[in-house]
Structure formats: C-alpha cells, structure tokens
C-alpha cells in the first residue's frame, strides 16, 4: 500500500504548556490533528472552570492563521475541587474530562491527590453526570519499584475505585503494561485506555543501553519488551477501548540534559508518520483510522471528524527536524531509531 486516507485524527492526551512554549509547539499538533485533550498540569495548574476558560483562550490565540483546531479542556483534580464547578464546566461544554494525578507522579503533579477519599464528592458527581475521569495510573509510594507503579495502581487504587463507583467512566491514560491492557480488556464497561506513540516503539533499553538517553525518558517510564508488544497488539486490534493519546510533552533541552532531567517525549510533529510505520509493520494499516480517528471520539461521546488526511509512502525517508526552536528554547523531537517513509500530505 502506497497511500492511506483516514478521517482527520485527534490526540486524546496532549501537553501544550503555556506562553512561549505553547506558541512554539501548537502548530505541530494543529497542522494534523483536529482536536486534543489538553493536560492541565501548568504552573499553577488548571483547577477551575475559570482557569480552563482562560487557558483555552490562550491556546486559540496561539493558533496559526488558517489552522482549525479545538482544544478539549480538562481540570486538574485536587482534594479541594468543587463538584458544582466541575458540573457547571461540563454542562457548558467547556470541560471534557477531569484529570487525576497522584501527587508526585509526573511533571507538575505535586498539587495532585494524596487522599482519594477527599476527592470522592467530585468523583461521585462526575459519575452521576457522565463526565470521564482521566487517570495517570501510577502509585508514588517510595517502596514501589518504578517499573511496577502501574500494576500496583490498578490493584490498590483503580480497581477499588471502580468497584465503589462502577458508573464512573475512566480513561487509563498512557497505558504502558500488559497488566493495564489486560485490565481494560477484562472490564465490562466504563473503562478505556489511551496509548502513546513512543510506548509502541521503545522499551526501557532505549533509555539505558549505551548510556543514559534522556530524550527517551518519560513517565510512565517505558517498560520491558513484552509490555511494548502487548501495547502494539492492543493498538492494532481495532478494539474500540484503545485509542491514541500521544502524551507529547515538550521540555527545553537544558531541562532534559542535566543531572535530574524532566520526564517527557515530544512526538507531535512526527506521530502520524511513526504510527503508519508501526501499523504497516504489524500488517494493520486498515486499523490505523480506528486507533487515531474513531475510537477516541466514540469513547468521549463526540462525532468523528469529517475532514480527511492522506498519508503517502515515500521512497526516500521523510526528514523531520532533530529539534524545534521555541521562544522558550530548543526542544528535541522524538527519534524512533528507524527511517520514516510515511508522510502526511498537505491538504488541498
């Protein structure tokens, strides 16, 4: 197959940051993707509907001329979040989901939830009104090995929560383990998972073999090869419970290339080329549209995009920049460590 036309994709987990970084990265998303769920872990975080309104306005202001893109806003769940504010934001159409960060789990998550019981009034309201909860599914207790955080989270946090509130709609974001995939598959309802581009491509060797490679470090951290293969199988299966959420997370290089570097991989610019490679490799190009364009909207109760994009297979590798320059500083682009031959063609 030399070309494939699919509905315009969406990104169901995206970090755009703010200020100069937002202005520097947004075009890489809005050029290809029609919508994205925007992560709320700014400094300070997006905790109220008023915060989300202001942030959405900054995103729209930063859009390049001629780009059509809808930011789908989320709220950062805290132990003090107002159920009434959440419901008002959801009913207004502004708020698409609420994000649960266990305190300390990832970038700018120190204000996250430490005692889930204190957030139960919000979660109960969300269950009642049908508003999804997006979870960063890792525990942060120091005695748990970093490679086991997701599996332990499922057993000790997520499964008890879902048994207590079975009507709560939960998205397990950036699933990284076979445990997570199996847990979603076993669920009868109200559970789905997003999968990143990079977790389909790298395992933990990418970070550690031949030297420490900070631009492959992310949270949740990449796992063993058997987990990567489980993610691939889920992504290419066509199962409607799995969809694309890139977790594209820009950090300027000085914050990555240091003694205590930030977690995050920047994939917005080359995600669709990477995905086409993965799905072609798996003999599943016919399932790419479901993963990138159909399953996510169905889960979030939205219509798929009417616009189409075409990916064309080039004889020579498609060249992406090694770095992008932003007003905040340089950001290294994800290198999949293989040549990319699929290119998103300019729209007529």
UniProtKB/Swiss-Prot annotation:
It comes from the Bacteria. GO terms for cellular component: cytosol. The keyword ATP-binding does not apply. Keywords: Hydrolase, Metal-binding, Pyrimidine biosynthesis, Zinc. It catalyses: (S)-dihydroorotate + H2O = N-carbamoyl-L-aspartate + H(+). Its EC number is 3.5.2.3. Zn(2+) 1 binds at residues 13, 15, 99, 247. The keyword Hydrolase applies. Substrate binds at residues 15-17, 41, 136, 219, 251, 263. InterPro entries: Amidohydro-rel, DHOdimr, Dihydroorotase_CS, Metal_Hydrolase. Pathway: Pyrimidine metabolism; UMP biosynthesis via de novo pathway; (S)-dihydroorotate from bicarbonate: step 3/3. Binds 2 Zn(2+) ions per subunit. Its cofactor is Zn(2+). Zn(2+) 2 binds at residues 99, 136, 174. The modification N6-carboxylysine is found at residue 99. GO terms for molecular function: dihydroorotase activity; zinc ion binding. PROSITE patterns: DIHYDROOROTASE_1, DIHYDROOROTASE_2. The active site is at residue 247. GO terms for biological process: 'de novo' pyrimidine nucleobase biosynthetic process; 'de novo' UMP biosynthetic process. It holds the Pfam family Amidohydro_1. Disulfide bonds: none annotated. Catalyzes the reversible cyclization of carbamoyl aspartate to dihydroorotate. Belongs to the metallo-dependent hydrolases superfamily. DHOase family. Class II DHOase subfamily. HAMAP family: PyrC_classII (MF_00219). Homodimer. This is Dihydroorotase. It comes from Rhizobium etli (strain CIAT 652).
